[in-house]
């Protein structure tokens, strides 16, 4: 049985798509090993079928500290890969892939890199010259070296199986035009106030890195929104830290808004199925999932994201009329409230955005697996 190594870490945005790819490759008869770091250890579940290996590389702004750490990590990775003898190594970008990719190059194992964002990251750009193929999610990608263009294959991003099973969530099946929808939200770690099925549902989350900003901005925006339109019936599903939930709960209760809180949503499919609109960061895996199911979003890019890639992701979607980009440095509770009210008041805008999203949907798990099989 041929072995394939996947390398991803740092955030859930890198981790979960790689796991989804691994599960597709296992179905095709490959033995899949996954090298990740300590940050992503928390996401490993017993029912995941790939074989995990933890290889941590701590970041440091001091080159004299980082180089010895990198050297040790590369030696460990060489030993790991030498014993496995993989047919190919696939890297998803970010600093956790550096050591395993160097090891693969040293052992002459073919490498493929996958860029999930619309801006080629520094690590992927560095390894582009060594890669057999470069898989990308967006047809328009920034920061791509001229020499790398011949290696490009547009595969789209890889979406988790439980999200793919949702297929297309038609706008008419949400709260926009029908009141028959039943709540599927049963998160055990949530704070839930019962809702009826006629409410417009907004799902707010900040990804695996969370979003402290949202715990302050969103409640203030909802207050503005209800002042402008007191008759609105809303349901809010929101990722929030435990110590923020009491304060937010008090605000929403006074506004007679139903709500659900969780520190982290383990099964996003349940929340996606409920939502009429999403407010989130603009990480690649979030965008791919929303694209796959045709769920429109207001994106507030994380300003500290490497190479400002979240801004480029969100701006591209706004240009394609598939979402809306509001920059954190320029946003206010009033501006966000105005945008939400505009979308609630004009369902056709949401419907058009949903259809535009579906036009760019790809079966990334299959296309990337096909590419890997071509290289082996």
UniProtKB/Swiss-Prot annotation:
Class in the EC hierarchy, top level: transferase
GO molecular function ontology, one term from the record: UDP-N-acetyl-D-glucosamine:N-acetylmuramoyl-L-alanyl-D-glutamyl-meso-2,6-diaminopimelyl-D-alanyl-D-alanine-diphosphoundecaprenol 4-beta-N-acetylglucosaminlytransferase activity
UniProt binding sites for UDP-N-acetyl-alpha-D-glucosamine: 11-13, 117, 160, 208, 310
GO CC terms, sorted: plasma membrane
GO process annotations (BP): carbohydrate metabolic process; cell division; cell wall organization; lipid glycosylation; peptidoglycan biosynthetic process; regulation of cell shape
EC numbers on record: 2.4.1.227
Reactions it catalyzes: di-trans,octa-cis-undecaprenyl diphospho-N-acetyl-alpha-D-muramoyl-L-alanyl-D-glutamyl-meso-2,6-diaminopimeloyl-D-alanyl-D-alanine + UDP-N-acetyl-alpha-D-glucosamine = di-trans,octa-cis-undecaprenyl diphospho-[N-acetyl-alpha-D-glucosaminyl-(1->4)]-N-acetyl-alpha-D-muramoyl-L-alanyl-D-glutamyl-meso-2,6-diaminopimeloyl-D-alanyl-D-alanine + UDP + H(+)
Main location: membrane
Secretion signal span: none
Family: Belongs to the glycosyltransferase 28 family. MurG subfamily.
Keyword Glycosyltransferase on entry: yes
Protein's cellular compartments: Cell inner membrane
Membrane topology: Peripheral membrane protein
One Pfam family of this chain: Glyco_tran_28_C
Function: Cell wall formation. Catalyzes the transfer of a GlcNAc subunit on undecaprenyl-pyrophosphoryl-MurNAc-pentapeptide (lipid intermediate I) to form undecaprenyl-pyrophosphoryl-MurNAc-(pentapeptide)GlcNAc (lipid intermediate II).
Protein name: UDP-N-acetylglucosamine--N-acetylmuramyl-(pentapeptide) pyrophosphoryl-undecaprenol N-acetylglucosamine transferase
PANTHER family, sorted: GLYCOSYLTRANSFERASE, UDP-N-ACETYLGLUCOSAMINE--N-ACETYLMURAMYL-(PENTAPEPTIDE) PYROPHOSPHORYL-UNDECAPRENOL N-ACETYLGLUCOSAMINE TRANSFERASE 1
Annotated keywords: Cell cycle, Cell division, Cell inner membrane, Cell membrane, Cell shape, Cell wall biogenesis/degradation, Glycosyltransferase, Membrane, Peptidoglycan synthesis, Transferase
Pathway(s) of this molecule: Cell wall biogenesis; peptidoglycan biosynthesis
SUPFAM superfamilies per the UniProt record, alphabetical: UDP-Glycosyltransferase/glycogen phosphorylase
Gene assigned in the entry: murG
């Amino acid at each position: 049985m041929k072995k394939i190594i996947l390398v991803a870490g740092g955030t859930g945005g890198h981790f979960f798509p790689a796991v989804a790819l691994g599960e597709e490759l296992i179905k095709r008869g490959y033995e899949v090993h996954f090298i990740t770091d300590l940050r992503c250890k928390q996401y490993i579940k017993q029912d995941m079928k790939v074989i995990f290996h933890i290889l941590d590389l701590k970041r440091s702004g001091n080159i004299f500290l980082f180089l010895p750490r990198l050297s040790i990590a590369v030696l460990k990775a060489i030993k790991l890969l030498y014993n496995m003898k993989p047919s190919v190594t696939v890297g998803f970008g970010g600093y956790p892939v550096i050591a395993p990719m160097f090891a693969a190059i040293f052992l002459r194992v073919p490498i493929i890199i996958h860029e999930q964002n619309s801006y080629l990251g520094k690590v992927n750009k560095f390894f582009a010259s060594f890669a057999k193929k470069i898989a990308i999610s967006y047809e328009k990608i920034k920061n791509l070296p001229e020499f790398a263009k011949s290696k490009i294959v547009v595969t789209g991003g890889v979406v988790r199986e439980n999200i793919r099973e949702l297929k297309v969530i038609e706008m008419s099946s949400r709260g926009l035009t029908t009141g028959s929808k039943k709540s599927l939200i049963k998160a055990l770690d949530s704070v839930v106030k019962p809702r009826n099925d006629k409410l417009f549902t907004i799902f707010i989350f900040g990804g695996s890195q969370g979003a402290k900003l949202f715990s302050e901005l969103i409640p203030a925006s909802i207050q503005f929104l209800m002042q402008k339109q007191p008759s609105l019936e809303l349901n809010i599903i929101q990722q929030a830290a435990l110590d923020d939930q009491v304060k937010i709960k008090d605000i929403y209760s006074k506004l007679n808004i139903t709500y659900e809180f969780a520190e982290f949503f383990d099964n996003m499919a349940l929340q996606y199925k409920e939502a009429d609109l999403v407010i989130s960061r603009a990480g690649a895996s979030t965008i791919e999932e929303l694209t796959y199911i045709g769920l429109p979003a207001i994106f507030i890019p994380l300003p500290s994201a490497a190479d400002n890639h979240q801004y480029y992701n969100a701006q591209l979607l706004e240009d394609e009329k598939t979402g809306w980009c509001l920059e954190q440095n320029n946003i206010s509770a009033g501006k966000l409230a105005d945008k939400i009210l505009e979308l609630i008041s004009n369902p056709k805008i949401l419907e058009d955005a949903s259809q535009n999203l579906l036009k760019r949907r790809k079966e990334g798990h299959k296309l990337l697996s096909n590419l890997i099989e071509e290289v082996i």
